[in-house]
């Protein structure tokens, strides 16, 4: 098989993966995502760094003179891809206007369409759900050209150190056929908690009512620690030193002073927030951090989280409320300036909707889940944490737990009203079915290791090659089916 590999070089053992693929008789014609920090040369393989691809630069040695601008027909066939890619640009190209983003998209499409036609891969393999503009264009082209797609979705067990799970999907990130097959195979069987791997047992116990541990995700704890106290001071000192070095200190100081007198996203949010009333019936909606993969592409049209809340608002009865809470690290990572994913008036639009209340960002998310009648999310981990607490979940995207009992996917007001009525009528969560689902998930996912922040990254160096071996052992048998 001729393989285009979209795999980040930060993943330990990636070169082992390429060697394993070649030893199995496959040809890795193109590797994008590799070699950011090292000059890697692999005979017979084009190596394209992630940074170069992200910035629209071609791989070394690629002749682009015959990579022509995309045809109108191709652009029309990829309208959905284009729509999502434009939102992905909020991360690195927030400063671009819509017209510049569209032209950048056309240029990127031109390059990758040329690559696909020149190197003719039979299979495209992604290390993650594609969520960079260039990688999602590769994904869109592969689907259009009927090229086989294999991708791996990392599901973070971030409340349990060193225990990510990696789930393989075939053909689309929207569903996992291996997981569906495992569910069908286990149909009619009941499993106990002891039948699960130890990491999933611990995860389950961590989020059930009679367990005393702290369920706060490890990544959230580490991120808050990184942006507080001495570490925050050190980070700011480093930024100041860098600004002095590149002579931008005066420009940035002026911009900072001006910012002090302008309204920011936190001020807008705080001016609209209110305390929760647990005596009322409500649906809890924890917002996703944006821009990120969890909403673009995995949320589809509901990358617009206001649209999600509008659907909920139009679907519930007047005596119910919707409690919305911002993601705990949204302002830490992106700062307090308005930007494309949190524009001026963003929170105001939400708060004006019928029965919608904004909760303080420091409000206890687990208390909100516990006192709610249901939780609604695009694909957030709060959804699965809710069903472990026997709360039904409304989802708008395609998370790994989408096939689980007590999870209801909706796409608009009509389907949302039907789900709301089930909840009103007293829908009950069956924990046995949750354990059965985890067993199927356990059977088809492979052990991974977290690499979200620096302490985790250090652990990853020790265990990443074991993770890669797990992936290789899952991937190679699947490729045999395609041969």
Identify the role of each PLM range.
Residues 117, 276-277, 367-368:
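Structural alpha-helical scaffold elements that stabilize or flank donor/cofactor-binding regions
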Residues 340-359:
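Nucleotide-activated donor-binding/catalytic signature segment of Leloir-type glycosyltransferases, i.e.
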Residues 126-130, 360-407:
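A donor-sugar binding/catalytic signature common to diverse glycosyltransferases
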Residues 233-343:
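Conserved catalytic-core segment of nucleotide-activated headgroup transferases in glycan assembly
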Residues 120-125:
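Proline-aspartate-enriched helix->loop->beta-strand connector
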Residues 20-113, 117-118, 157-254:
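Conserved N-terminal ligand/cofactor-binding loop architecture of enzyme catalytic domains
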Residues 179-227, 406-483:
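Leloir-type glycosyltransferase catalytic cores
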Residues 13-26, 311-319:
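A short, Lys/Arg-enriched amphipathic alpha-helix followed by its capping loop at the start of a domain
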């Amino acid at each position: 098989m001729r393989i285009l590999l979209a795999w980040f070089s930060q993943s330990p053992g990636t070169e082992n993966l390429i060697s394993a693929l070649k030893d199995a008789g496959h040809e890795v014609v193109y590797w994008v995502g590799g070699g950011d920090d090292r000059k890697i040369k692999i005979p017979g393989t084009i190596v394209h760094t992630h940074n170069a691809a992200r910035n629209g630069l071609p791989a070394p040695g690629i002749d682009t003179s015959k990579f022509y601008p995309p045809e109108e027909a191709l652009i029309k066939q990829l309208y959905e891809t284009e729509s999502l890619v434009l939102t992905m640009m909020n991360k690195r190209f927030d400063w671009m206007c819509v017209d510049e983003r569209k032209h950048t998209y056309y240029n990127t499409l031109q390059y990758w369409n040329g690559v696909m036609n020149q190197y003719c891969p039979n299979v495209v393999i992604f290390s993650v759900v594609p969520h960079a503009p260039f990688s999602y264009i590769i994904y869109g082209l592969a689907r259009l050209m009927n090229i086989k797609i294999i991708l791996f979705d990392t599901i973070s067990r971030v409340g349990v150190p060193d225990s990510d799970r990696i789930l393989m999907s075939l053909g689309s990130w929207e569903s996992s056929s291996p997981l569906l097959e495992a569910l069908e195979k286990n149909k009619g069987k009941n499993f106990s908690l002891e039948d699960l791997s130890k990491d999933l047992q611990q995860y389950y116990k961590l989020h059930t009512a009679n367990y005393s541990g702290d369920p706060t995700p490890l990544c959230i704890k580490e991120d808050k620690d990184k942006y507080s106290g001495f570490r925050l001071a050190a980070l700011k000192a480093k930024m100041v030193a860098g600004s002095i070095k590149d002579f931008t200190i005066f420009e940035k100081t002026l911009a900072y002073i001006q910012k002090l007198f302008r309204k920011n996203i936190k001020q807008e949010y705080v001016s609209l927030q209110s305390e929760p009333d647990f005596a009322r019936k409500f649906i809890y909606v924890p917002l996703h951090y944006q821009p990120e993969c969890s909403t673009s592409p995995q949320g589809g049209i509901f990358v617009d989280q206001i649209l999600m809340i509008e659907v909920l608002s139009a679907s519930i009865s007047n005596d119910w409320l919707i409690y919305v809470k911002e993601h705990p690290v949204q302002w830490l990572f992106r700062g307090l300036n308005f930007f494309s994913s949190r524009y001026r008036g963003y929170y105001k639009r939400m708060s004006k909707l019928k029965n919608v209340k904004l909760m303080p960002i420091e409000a206890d998310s687990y208390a909100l889940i516990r006192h709610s009648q249901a939780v609604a999310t695009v694909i957030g981990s709060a959804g699965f944490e809710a069903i472990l607490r026997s709360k039904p979940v409304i989802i708008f995207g395609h998370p790994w737990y989408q096939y689980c009992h007590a999870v209801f996917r909706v796409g608009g007001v009509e389907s949302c009203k039907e789900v709301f009525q089930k909840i009103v009528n007293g829908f009950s969560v069956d924990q046995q079915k949750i354990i059965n689902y985890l067993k199927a998930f356990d059977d088809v996912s492979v052990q991974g290791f977290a690499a979200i922040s620096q302490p985790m990254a250090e652990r990853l160096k020790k265990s990443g090659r074991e993770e890669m071996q797990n992936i290789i052992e899952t991937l190679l048998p699947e490729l045999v089916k395609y041969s």
